[in-house]
């Protein structure tokens, strides 16, 4: 059982509450620190969780570590406050100060998204040859930077960066709070960046509308000397002959399946990803965050980092955040 306290009552904090509610044998929330009285009432009614009106009250609860979900303007100060008390912290992004000390890891979840782990498994198999190029349109700013480094294995190499910004007129019909009553065309900003490393390249192309829109889909291309992945199709050469397979999500709960709605695994010739929480009704985002929680406990037990303050700061620097 992994026990954690939560600081903050924003949109991100609810992911950690849902994970504990859906996986009660794996995770437990010791309490959540909320300053706003209206939000205290809302969360008390919505979740079976202890509401703490002060940080001191939260820190008296029984936890392995604290998850900080404060707004980005207060992230660094909260980390410093908890580090001074020797409290281990899993903090939400972004983290822009690489000099922070203490037992801190950053919840960069995109490394642990099922499809991205499947891509990484294909890369590590060697069938693509030497991977040298990534083109991604799936997440914003520092998250994209972390994925670029994850797939290209460029470490802390500083690339040359070319940036442009375009306007992408698109109908906004959905948001964090659900479908809009009056969809309307908006001038969405589309950011494009080209990263030129010593012998590798990456192209970033993203609009925030993609997170909540089915008319602006995610795209991924990973290229190597012997093959490529384009979204869910992998093409490569074997003994000089072109081969191809589809990357397939295998789920429960569709049609006549009575096992409940969930992702079981991802396959493509071989098993590329297996859900560590089988039969759990978690979205891919929630699976990735739950994996961060597992990694945080492993970090505390072994000292093995999974996404450090240094990593987070470097990725923010690539987008000048």
Residue spans for each PLM region:
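Receiver (REC) domain switch-region micro-motif
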Residues: 32, 66, 134
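C-terminal helix-rich "cap/oligomerization" subdomain common to oxidoreductases
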Residues: 44-46, 57, 65-70, 271-321
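Short acidic low-complexity segments
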Residues: 50-61
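Beta-strand-loop-alpha-helix segment that lines the small-molecule cofactor/substrate pocket
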Residues: 63-113, 126
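Rossmann-like NAD(P)H-binding beta-loop-alpha module
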Residues: 114-133, 144
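Rossmann-like dinucleotide-binding domain that binds NAD(P)(H)
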Residues: 130-217, 221
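NAD(P)-dinucleotide binding in Rossmann-like oxidoreductases
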Residues: 201-291
């Amino acid at each position: 059982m992994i026990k954690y306290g939560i600081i903050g009552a924003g949109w991100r904090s609810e992911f950690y509450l849902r994970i504990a509610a859906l996986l009660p044998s794996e995770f437990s929330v010791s309490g959540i620190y909320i300053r706003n009285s209206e939000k205290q009432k809302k969360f008390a009614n919505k979740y079976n969780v202890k509401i703490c009106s002060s940080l001191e009250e939260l820190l008296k609860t029984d936890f392995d570590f604290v998850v900080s979900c404060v707004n980005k303007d207060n992230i660094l100060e909260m980390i410093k406050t908890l580090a001074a008390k020797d409290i281990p912290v899993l903090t939400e992004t972004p983290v822009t100060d690489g000099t922070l000390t203490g037992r801190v890891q950053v919840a960069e979840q995109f490394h642990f998204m099922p499809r991205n782990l499947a891509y990484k498994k294909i890369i590590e198999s060697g069938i693509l040859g030497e991977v040298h190029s990534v083109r991604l349109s799936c997440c914003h700013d520092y998250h994209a930077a972390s994925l670029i480094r994850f797939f290209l294995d460029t470490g802390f190499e500083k690339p040359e960066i070319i940036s442009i910004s375009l306007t992408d007129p698109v109908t906004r019909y959905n948001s964090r709070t659900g479908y809009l009553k009056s969809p309307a065309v908006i001038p969405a900003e589309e950011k494009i960046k080209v990263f030129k490393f010593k012998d590798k390249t990456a192209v970033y192309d993203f609009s925030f509308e993609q997170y909540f829109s089915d008319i602006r889909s995610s795209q991924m291309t990973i290229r190597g000397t012997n093959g490529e992945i384009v979204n869910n199709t992998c093409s490569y050469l074997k003994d000089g002959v072109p081969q191809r397979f589809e990357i397939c999500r295998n789920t429960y709960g569709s049609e006549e399946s009575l096992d409940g709605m969930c992702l079981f695994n991802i396959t493509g010739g071989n098993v590329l990803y297996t859900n560590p929480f089988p039969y759990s009704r978690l979205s891919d985002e929630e699976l990735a965050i739950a994996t961060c929680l597992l990694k945080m406990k492993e970090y505390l037990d072994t000292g093995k980092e999974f996404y450090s303050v240094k990593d987070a700061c470097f990725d923010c620097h690539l987008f000048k955040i």
